[in-house]
Amino acid sequence: MFLDIVSGYERFLIIVLITFLVSCFFVYQCWKIYISPWSHIPGIATSFPIIGNILSLTSRSDSLKNLDGYHKRLGDTFIIWILFKPVVFSCNIDLFDSILKSSDKDFLEKGSGYETFRDWIQDGIVCSTGKKWQKRRKQLTTCFHFNMLKNYLPIIDSHSQAFVDILKKEGGNVIQDIAKLTKLMSLGIICESATGMNLMNKENEAKLHQYLESLEVVSFLTAERRRRPFYYSNIMLKMMHIGSEYQKAVKTVHAFTRELIIEAVNHYNESNPKSNFLDILSSLHHNGEIDTEGLMEETNTLIFAGHDTVSASLAWLLYNLGMNTVAQEKAFHEAEIVSKMEGSMEEKMKQMKFIECTIKESLRLRSTIPFIARCMKKDVSFPNGMTIPRGTELVLNFRAMHKDNDVWQNPEKFIPERFDGNSSSQRPVFSFVPFSAGPRNCIGQRFAMMELKVSLFHILLNFKIEAVDKESDLAEVLDVVMNNSGGIKLKLSERT
């Protein structure tokens, strides 16, 4: 044997050399299989073994800022590594076009980040995939049909007027976080639209506040789980203090939903017209088309998606108008003219042209859902030749697209006029996607726009809006939706 005729020292060196060469070969094979397919995509220089770039995303206060910086530095598409998972962020318009309009099942599966929602909203329409998602999407579309939306409009109008009364009680003082108040209004709207029952009364006040407090805990800890992968595992989560806090809050949220469902199912009458969300779900349940678990899944999803995103959008809309008095006064004058018109609120809404422009511009400037993620089941190629391999988690960055200099002139400025008919028609189809687009777009987007229009209409008629914080003082953070770390402070002065 060769090793028998060499000294112990030489034998040691040979073993070290062989080990080194085998290790190099192993590392090369790992690189070839796990890294090389993505090596052509620009990436962040600061990366660590095993954990990758995860440290740049774990901070609640800095993660959005970091991602904005990477887009400016690396271009419209770049890769980060979270543990061993490749995550590609993109605001490339051609890629948006390829992915969003596609009905190919290989592009429709949601990214792994949505798994952190499952304890809360379970396998509802937001998280489900495949045939289950297709079936549920078809079933739930009825809930947001044009004729159903007519039923919801008086509810939205009534709660918006009640919201104005709540704001008047503030007496012109600085509201420390308008989002806390808009949440309560939006929750009242979605609950009554879902059940036909107005829960905004003394009898239910404590229950609603408990629900909102628990929902705030669930939302915050869900966002924390997305930022910190070692919280992904339910086993790991249960071993930590926040795990018990999280589970307790989830139980409270589910108990609230369960009570609504029991009430709806007990009062279901097949001969009555279907006038709300739970009427339709109860009908499906009665006919055996959806089980009790499905009722829970979709009701939890509806209440979360129907109030959290809309309330945040309204809060940011009021802030943006508070920062832009010219646009605010123009919107007020339109509201004043519309208020004097004859006809129903439905007819009046059609005349709120500039108000709609301000809403769209606010959704562009501050997207409350700045990203969506898809798991690529096959390769996708850009027209410029770049390929994103299958197995990639692809994050479509709406926030970056909505501020792309190539699409929007002065993208950091609030200019509602860019959404008048002429300007809108000159932009790429998928350059403005606050509700996503294509087969997996937001099923309730028309409901959301109705709520934003009507509530803003009533607020403008009654108040002048003044933003307290300068834009430079904001600290935008991504929880489940985009918020301001210190709250959105406003001063509302009654119009005389």
Residue ranges: model-predicted function:
Residues 2-135, 150, 154-166, 249, ...:
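N-terminal membrane-proximal hinge/A-helix region immediately C-terminal to the signal-anchor transmembrane segment
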Residues 325-327, 445-482:
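Cytochrome P450 heme-binding "Cys pocket" and the immediately downstream C-terminal segment
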Residues 396-423:
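Conserved cytochrome P450 K-helix/beta-meander segment immediately N-terminal to the heme-binding cysteine loop
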